[in-house]
A protein has these predicted regions:
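N-terminal Rossmann NAD(P)H-binding glycine-rich loop of SDR-like oxidoreductase domains
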Residues: 5-24
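NAD(P)H-binding glycine-rich loop region in Rossmannoid oxidoreductase-like domains
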Residues: 49-88
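Conserved Rossmann-fold NAD(P)-dependent oxidoreductase catalytic core, especially the SDR/UDP-sugar
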Residues: 94-137
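Active-site Tyr-X1-5-Lys
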Residues: 119-122, 133-161, 190
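NAD(P)-dependent short-chain dehydrogenase/reductase
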Residues: 150-204, 210-214
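Conserved C-terminal active-site "lid" loop/helix of NAD(P)H-dependent oxidoreductases
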Residues: 210, 244, 264-289
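Mid/C-terminal beta-alpha module of Rossmann-like enzyme folds, strongest
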Residues: 219-267
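Amphipathic terminal alpha-helices
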Residues: 279-281, 292-305
Length: 305
């Protein structure tokens, strides 16, 4: 057994895929979430990351030595309840960090997001250290946690590894994000339903297949600390697409999806996010390359729905 890993938010859009992959790599995994488990076939406990006493109990009971912290409120839902989003995303991050300090656990994986960038971030091609003035409370909360992450790493108190994820394409139901359309379109195509898109047809955003996101994250966690050149999160991306281009790809693989547009508040969020990502730092440091392009992502995910 390589590591004993606790995963928060394990039933969410990303967590469930990390559970399966980490178990397949001979790790012990304790999955946790705030709701009952009807999805995962592994040890599971109810855990709210705001409950430090419960967290301390679980870390000791299961002899945990790593945490993957996915518990969060996402971008679109976050705008509907900014104060709760700040509390869950930021206090939750600090609670997990404090639990690790108390229990002598050094290593944490925590996902950041392209939401940390803003309109001053050279959105046509965003490098790892662009100016950041996020326009959503989700992005603000992620950026605040990035600064805390830098502090813990710089002071050598913890070893927190992180990637700024773009839109993630998987067969799990979307969870309240601005890139949800990418998966919703696949579901409607497979179910032969019409789709109404909440973004403009030419809105370009970076995306990646969930397997690429998982593989890159675990590879980053497994690398020697000396090979990690950043104390803050790495950029990552696989491809860029727009609703109109994604529609063309879906039709090219044999699904006659009908789509119209009803643009909502998420357009303003998307307009403040990168169109393309420079992820050369991650690729150079851990020798990572994606396995899925846009066509193969659509084909693979729609087959799984």
């Amino acid at each position: 057994m390589k590591n004993r890993i606790l995963i928060t938010g394990a039933l969410g859009q990303l967590g469930q895929f990390f559970v399966k992959s980490l178990i397949s790599k001979n790790n012990y995994v304790l999955a946790t979430d705030i709701k009952e488990n009807k999805l995962l076939n592994c040890d599971f406990e109810i855990f709210d990351i705001m409950d430090e006493e419960r967290g301390d109990y679980l870390l000791k009971k299961y002899n945990i030595n790593q945490i993957y912290n996915f518990a969060a409120i996402l971008s679109a839902k976050g705008e509907q309840n900014p104060l709760l989003t700040w509390e869950i995303n930021n206090a939750g991050f600090i609670n997990i960090a404090n639990l690790c300090l108390k229990n002598n656990i050094k290593k944490i994986f925590w996902p950041s997001s392209i939401a940390v960038f803003g309109r001053n971030s050279n959105l046509d091609l965003v490098n790892n250290d662009e100016p950041m003035h996020p326009e959503t409370i989700y992005g603000v909360s992620k950026l605040a946690c990035e600064k805390a992450m830098f502090y813990f790493n710089y002071k050598n108190l913890l070893d927190i590894r992180s990637i700024r994820f773009p839109g993630i394409v998987s067969n799990s139901k979307p969870g309240g994000g601005t890139t949800d359309y990418i998966v919703e379109m696949l579901y409607c195509a497979k179910q032969k339903k019409n789709y109404t898109c909440f973004l403009k047809d030419d809105t370009i955003l970076p995306m990646m297949h969930v397997n690429d996101a998982v593989d890159a994250s675990i590879k980053l966690m497994e690398f020697d600390k000396g090979a990690i050149s950043l104390n803050h999160p790495y950029n990552i991306s696989s491809f860029e697409t727009s609703p109109s281009k994604w529609l063309e790809i879906i039709r090219s693989i044999g699904f006659d999806l009908n789509m119209n547009y009803n643009v909502d508040f998420r357009q303003n969020i998307a307009d403040s996010w990168p169109k393309r990502i420079d992820d050369s730092s991650l690729r150079n440091d851990i020798k990572w390359v994606p396995n899925f392009n846009d066509f193969h992502t659509a084909k693979n995910i729609i087959d799984l729905i």
